[in-house]
C-alpha cells in the first residue's frame, strides 16, 4: 500500500514539474522603474525635475560643507575648529585631496545633481505634454545643471562634463575651464528664455527667469574672456 502511495506522490510531482513552463518565471517586476517605463507622463517630468532640486540640500552642497568651504576660505569667516585637517582646508593647506568633507563630497554631490538634470533633459522632450510646461521643466533642469557646473569651475577650474545620461562603465574625459563656462552660458541662455518671471503659490521655490539672469551675471564676472568680449562689443 505504501509503495502505491509513494508512487502516486512521485507521479504527481513529476506531472507538476513537467507541466510548468519556464516562461512563467519571466515576468516584469512592477516595482522596478527603468528609463523605458518611467518617462511617459507629464507627472514623470515634474517628479524628475523635482529630484534635481533635492541635491541643493545635501551635505556636500548648501546644507553643510559647501557653505563652510566657501565662507571660510573667503574674507567673511574663519575656522577655529580643533579638526586639524578641516582647519587646514579653510587656510588653503591642501595636504590631502581625498579629504571627504573638504573635497570629495562636493564632487560626488555636484555630479549626482548633474546626472539627474541630464536625465530630465534627455527624456522629457519625448513626453507628450503641454509645450509651455515642458519647456519650463527643461529650463529648470538647464538652470540647475548650469548651477552645478558653475560650482565645479569655482572649486576646481575644470572637471568632467557629461551632458547626457551614461551607464556606470562610462569614463568621461576632462573638460577645460572655458568649455565648462561655455556650457554654463548655453544652459543659462535656454533657462532665461523659458523660465517664468514668477511661480504660483504651489510652486514657490522653483527657479525663475531672475535667478537665471543673476547666475548669468555672476558667470560674466567670473569669466574673464567673456567679460573682455562683452566690453569690446560695448566699446
Would you name each region that the model predicts?
Residues 46-50, 54-59, 83-156, 171-179, ...:
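Conserved, well-structured interaction surfaces
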Residues 233-234:
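TPR/TPR-like (Sel1-like) alpha-helical repeat modules
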Amino acid at each position: 500500500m505504501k509503495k502505491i502511495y509513494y508512487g502516486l506522490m512521485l507521479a504527481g510531482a513529476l506531472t507538476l514539474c513537467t507541466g510548468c513552463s519556464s516562461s512563467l518565471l519571466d515576468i516584469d517586476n512592477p516595482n522596478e522603474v527603468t528609463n523605458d517605463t518611467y518617462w511617459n507622463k507629464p507627472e514623470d517630468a515634474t517628479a524628475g525635475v523635482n529630484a534635481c532640486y533635492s541635491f541643493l540640500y545635501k551635505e556636500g552642497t548648501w546644507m553643510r560643507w559647501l557653505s563652510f568651504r566657501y565662507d571660510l576660505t573667503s574674507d567673511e569667516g574663519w575656522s577655529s575648529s580643533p579638526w586639524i585637517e578641516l582647519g587646514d582646508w579653510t587656510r588653503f593647506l591642501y595636504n590631502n585631496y581625498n579629504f571627504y568633507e573638504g573635497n570629495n563630497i562636493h564632487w560626488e554631490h555636484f555630479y549626482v545633481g548633474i546626472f539627474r538634470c541630464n536625465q530630465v533633459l534627455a527624456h522629457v522632450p519625448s513626453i507628450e505634454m503641454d509645450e509651455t510646461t515642458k519647456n519650463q521643466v527643461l529650463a529648470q533642469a538647464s538652470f540647475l545643471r548650469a548651477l552645478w557646473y558653475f560650482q565645479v569651475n569655482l572649486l576646481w577650474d575644470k572637471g568632467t562634463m557629461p551632458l547626457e545620461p551614461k551607464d556606470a562603465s562610462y569614463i568621461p574625459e576632462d573638460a577645460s575651464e572655458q568649455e565648462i563656462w561655455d556650457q554654463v552660458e548655453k544652459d543659462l541662455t535656454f533657462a532665461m528664455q523659458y523660465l517664468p518671471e514668477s511661480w504660483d503659490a504651489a510652486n514657490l521655490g522653483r527657479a525663475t527667469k531672475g535667478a537665471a539672469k543673476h547666475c548669468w551675471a555672476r558667470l560674466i564676472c567670473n569669466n574673464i574672456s567673456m567679460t573682455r568680449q562683452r566690453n569690446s562689443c560695448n566699446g
